[in-house]
């Protein structure tokens, strides 16, 4: 199935002074739970006219795993797989203050396929100090087991709506608030995981993982960015999440950044803390009467109570014009990520190291 790894990093948002740009970067994630993910990506954005831009990108996740999830499921030797993803999009600005964007996002691997669509609208008010956006997303996925006929794969559908507002409070401060409502319907368990059930008779049986087929998610995020001086910038944010599986989480983050004159070089440090409770049907150990099974059962550690911390350093350097380009910028980031599971018997925690290196050429 598709392995959704929360790689807690992103390439620096490089300043865009040109209308077209090409980007390439590679990310590497490795933890002490024997999971390694290498993720290359290339992207191109091209201006067709003053009002229309097009973009295209390719990305991949090259995964090698022998983690606890794998070793306790039906793949005792671990696995290696590659996920591919494409993006094709167009942005239209009929007026300087108005933006419409449309993207198509297909992804595929040997046991998962997805076709996604996203639509974004944006409008700037009050001399462009207030920006409101509305994001609409939908995806149509198919989930199966490697080697299984696709006719036996199961469906998973998603729709989401996300309004957001950002406000330039003064020349030093920008604040934002965003909300997302998401609904998923279909197969949401792992076709590989099996859950041990302790019968009261003393026998332990193993049953396929089974999750509810309906899930509604809510997320509210607040953020602020403040210029402490012409060189120093601070940022902070908070996100609250709650869903119909009674799982809730809290995320807080903060960052500090220094920029040289004309932002030719930028360095920064970021920290993030996360805590979540467990889903209503999740149990570390399940018990049942002989011959019966719990209606819903899970061996997914990401549905258990857990907390994590992340800290990272990042840097960005502008090289100026190179060959036919107007500017080339190189960015790097390194992070350490600690996660601790409070109610997952096979694994108490894991530590990961994350590195990313990339470049953007503007032309």
What are the residue ranges of the model-derived segments?
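Outer membrane beta-barrel transmembrane domains
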Residues: 67-78, 182, 188-223, 242-253, ...
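Outer-membrane beta-barrel "beta-signal"
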Residues: 121, 172, 313-315, 351-363
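Short loop/turn motifs that connect adjacent beta-strands in outer-membrane beta-barrel proteins
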Residues: 16-19, 51, 96-97, 126-130, ...
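Transmembrane beta-strands of outer-membrane beta-barrel proteins
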Residues: 20-24, 54-56, 100-102, 130-134, ...
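Residue-level signature of outer-membrane beta-barrel architecture
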Residues: 46-48, 92, 123-125, 167, ...
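Transmembrane beta-strands of outer-membrane beta-barrel pores
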Residues: 26-32, 60-64, 106-110, 125-127, ...
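Membrane-embedded beta-strands of outer-membrane beta-barrel proteins
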Residues: 24, 42, 86-88, 119, ...
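Short glycine/proline- and aromatic-enriched beta-strand/turn motifs that initiate or cap beta-hairpins
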Residues: 17-55, 337, 349
């Amino acid at each position: 199935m598709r392995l959704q790894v929360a790689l807690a990093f992103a390439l620096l948002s490089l300043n865009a002074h040109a209308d077209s740009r090409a980007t390439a970067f590679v990310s590497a994630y490795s933890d002490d739970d024997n999971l390694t993910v290498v993720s290359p990506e290339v992207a191109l954005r091209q201006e067709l006219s003053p009002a229309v831009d097009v973009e295209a990108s390719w990305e991949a996740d090259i995964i090698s795993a022998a983690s606890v999830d794998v070793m306790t499921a039906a793949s005792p030797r671990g696995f290696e797989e590659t996920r591919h993803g494409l993006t094709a999009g167009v942005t239209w600005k009929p007026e300087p203050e108005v933006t419409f964007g449309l993207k198509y996002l297909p992804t595929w691997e040997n046991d998962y396929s997805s076709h996604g669509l996203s639509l974004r609208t944006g409008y700037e008010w009050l001399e462009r100090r207030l920006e409101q956006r509305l994001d609409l997303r939908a995806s149509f996925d198919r989930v199966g087991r490697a080697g299984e006929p696709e006719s036996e794969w199961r469906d998973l559908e998603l729709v989401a709506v996300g309004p957001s507002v950002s406000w330039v409070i003064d020349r030093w401060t920008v604040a934002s608030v965003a909300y997302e409502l998401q609904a998923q319907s279909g197969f949401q368990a792992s076709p590989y995981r099996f859950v041990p059930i302790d019968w009261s008779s003393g026998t332990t049986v193993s049953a396929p993982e089974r999750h509810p087929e309906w899930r509604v998610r809510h997320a509210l995020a607040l953020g602020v960015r403040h210029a402490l001086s012409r060189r120093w910038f601070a940022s902070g944010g908070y996100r609250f999440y709650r869903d119909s599986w009674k799982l809730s989480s809290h995320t807080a983050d903060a960052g500090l950044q220094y920029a040289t004159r004309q932002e030719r070089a930028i360095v920064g440090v970021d920290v993030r803390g996360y805590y979540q409770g467990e889903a209503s049907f999740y149990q570390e150990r399940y018990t049942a009467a002989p011959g019966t099974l719990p209606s819903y059962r899970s061996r997914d550690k990401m549905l258990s109570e857990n907390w994590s911390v992340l800290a990272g350093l990042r840097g960005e350097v502008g090289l100026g014009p190179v060959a036919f380009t107007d500017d080339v910028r190189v960015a790097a980031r390194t992070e350490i990520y600690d996660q601790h599971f409070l109610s997952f018997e096979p694994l108490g925690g894991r530590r990961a190291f994350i590195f990313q290196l990339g470049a953007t050429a503007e032309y």
